[in-house]
Amino acid sequence: MKTILSSETMNIPDGVTIKVNAKVIEVEGPRGKLVRDFKHLNLDFDLITDENGKKKLKIDAWFGSRKTSAAIRTALSHVENLITGVTKGFRYKMRFVYADFPINASITNDNKSIEIRNFLGEKKVRKVDLLDGVSIIRSEKVKDEVVLDGNDIELVSRSCALINQKCHVKKKDIRKFLDGIYVSEKGAVVVEE
């Protein structure tokens, strides 16, 4: 069954400006600017003003199936992530896990890449270049922890995945050999009191 019109709106917080140009959403805030392309979705994006004068983003789906109606909520979640990115930012913390051989990691290239040494006692140096807009630092408080910061949640989480995949244990039982670098905490760069 097709629904004639399904739509949802979301509030735009103060200090954030949103521009809509043919399914390309541009969000600008105190931490920078993010652009997201929704051309693959059969949705209409509009900026509206409610009776109180507050700006809102409205997403419509005309004659959509259940999948199209579900895509509305997905698009709203993506825009919410963009707003969170330009206001608070995203911070992922990764911990080094090892049993015998301590993992040595050095951050190079102006906090844009990491080199991993002595993983499972191997001599090979594993180098991971982070995606654009993501920076990495060593944690001062916690031993064997790195912190990844960025505005785009997808770039930060994909950079974490690249680091995690570089430390993949091969030809051993992964239930026994739990060595690696794993995400331990996800949060915002700007923490509200």
From Swiss-Prot:
A Pfam family this chain is assigned to: Ribosomal_L6
One GO cellular component term noted in the UniProt record for this chain: cytosolic large ribosomal subunit
Protein name (record): Large ribosomal subunit protein uL6
Family: Belongs to the universal ribosomal protein uL6 family.
Keywords for this protein: Ribonucleoprotein, Ribosomal protein
UniProt KW Acyltransferase keyword: no
GO MF annotation: an example: rRNA binding
SUPFAM superfamilies noted in UniProt: Ribosomal protein L6
Biological-process GO terms, alphabetical: cytoplasmic translation
